[in-house]
Amino acid sequence: MSSDAENQASLKTYLRCLEEAKHRLAFAESFAVGSTGHPRVDIESACLQFRKALELIAYAAIAPHREKYSAWRRQAKGSKDYRKDFNGKKILHSLSRLNPYFYPRPLLPAVERNGAKHFEPFRGEYLTKKRYEKAYDRCGAILHADNPWGHDKQYENFSKEMPTYIEWTRTLIKLHSVLIEHSGGVAAWLVEAGDLTTKARGYIGKGIGEISVDPNYYG
């Protein structure tokens, strides 16, 4: 089980990644609305910034699981150094094998009940893990030059979808919880990424008794 100092260091790394991701999303949004006047350049620039934001979310997800992730990566056939990992989609796949509930769980604002704050799950639209993977792949394809004998990358369609993906991503990280499995049981982080006018902040909690998890919630 990690020490309090290690947990705080991991949380600090997590928040730093989310801070940068927020700004990357803002840059992606500015390009998505056509800031350069060149449609192809706009969507390619938006994809670059958005993909970097997705990778930062993946890096953030490593932070609370770093010890287990590092040990698991040392058993890999190829590169064994997790510090060289860069593919967001592959990072998510690896983390899923270590903790199926690692993915951020968006929440509604707190409600006061009996002197305590309660956070209900957000049930609307957000960037699910499946949507993350789809967006990551689509951005990757668009970032390469067009092969004149290849397939249509559907620039125009993805350009129209990009604002929705950005909004889903903001919803994912704005206020969420992270469940962490360790030798002492289950811990939970509560994280507020906020917006560009506020700094991301987080709180480390420890499970008391059982923590109920709905497997269908994590998609």
Regions from the PLM with identified roles:
Residues S3-N7, G78-Y218:
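Long, charged low-complexity segments
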Residues Q8-E19, G37-L48, S70-A71, F122-E133, ...:
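Short, solvent-exposed segments of well-ordered alpha helices
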Residues S30-N87:
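N-terminal interaction modules that seed assembly of large macromolecular complexes
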